[in-house]
Amino acid sequence: MMVEAKVPLKLTLFGEHAVVYDRPAIAMTISESLKVKVSENDKFLIISPSLNIKGVKLDLNEMKIESDEAKKVLRYVFEVLNYFEMKKPVKIEINSTVEPSVGLGTSAAVIVGTVAAYSKYLGIDLSRDEIAKISHNIELKVQGIASRMDTYTETYGGLIYFPAGGKGFEKIDTNFELTAGYIRRSMSTADVLWRVRTLKESNKEVFENILDVIGEITNRAKSLIVEQNFEELGLLMYVNHGLLFSLGITSPEADEIVSRAKQLGIKGCKISGGGAGGSIICIKSVEAEVLLRSYNARIVNSTLTKDGVIFSIL
């Protein structure tokens, strides 16, 4: 028996980092994806030929991991298997259309895909809510800090608004279009999250005020998306980027790209996701794509998808 889970990757439109501290956020799934394939084997074996530059191979029976990057990715897989008490040995193959740690939610996708595929292989029928909750708890366990935004967005799919307070979500029916690409990051999302936590502890009042403004922007952005008022929405993207800059989340290259976008008259542009480089999104235009390519950004297929994780028995 072989089970394959296909997980859409995601872009964060508004509220990244603020969502960790119970402010609202908006994210959407895109046409880039990650697949997790689970098949019968006599021992636990994890293979990821595309998720890292050199590829990864791990024998859990011997517990030998040579790559630091592999440790980060495969820790998620191990925790999923451990959650299900490693009931049956399997081979797990992970393939992604993009490289990891670029702000597109590949870490969450690894977890969601493994939870969905391995549970189905074991004959356990989980609801989407159960997949999302299990995945979020595992991400939180591994990283120490995490919001539910990535795991829930990739489980359910579509453009999703997460209200303040960390409970519930709302899917928004829209044909919103973006131009998106990614540049190299200087640190992982987990590392950026801890940097932001340090800032919070040293400047709590200022930090909370900035997050409150980001929350107000996110709520206004939700209304503008529904109204399809992309002119004002684009202005809020620039403001949101500036606030993320004030939190130390952006990078010099990303700031330069966003500044240049504004000079060129591109309607809206900001970083998306963890920061420190990574993904950059703009209101869809030819000019935005030309700009991103001029900085050697890898353009991603940012077409909005309505489906979350799906699985098939092969």
UniProtKB/Swiss-Prot annotation:
Could you tell me which InterPro entries the record lists for this protein? GHMP_kinase_C_dom, GHMP_kinase_C_sf, GHMP_kinase_N_dom, Mev_gal_kin, Mevalonate_kinase_arc, Ribosomal_Su5_D2-typ_SF, Ribsml_uS5_D2-typ_fold_subgr
Catalytic activity, reaction form: (R)-mevalonate + ATP = (R)-5-phosphomevalonate + ADP + H(+)
Q: What name does the UniProt record give this protein?
A: Mevalonate kinase
Species lineage: Archaea, Thermoproteota, Thermoprotei, Sulfolobales, Sulfolobaceae
Q: Tell me which species this is from.
A: Saccharolobus solfataricus (strain ATCC 35092 / DSM 1617 / JCM 11322 / P2) (Sulfolobus solfataricus)
Q: Which cysteine-cysteine pairs are annotated as disulfide bonds in the entry? A: none
User: In its keyword annotation, does this UniProt entry include Calcium?
Assistant: no
Pathway it works in: Isoprenoid biosynthesis; isopentenyl diphosphate biosynthesis via mevalonate pathway; isopentenyl diphosphate from (R)-mevalonate: step 1/3
Q: Where in the cell is it found?
A: Cytoplasm
* Cofactor(s) this protein requires: Mg(2+)
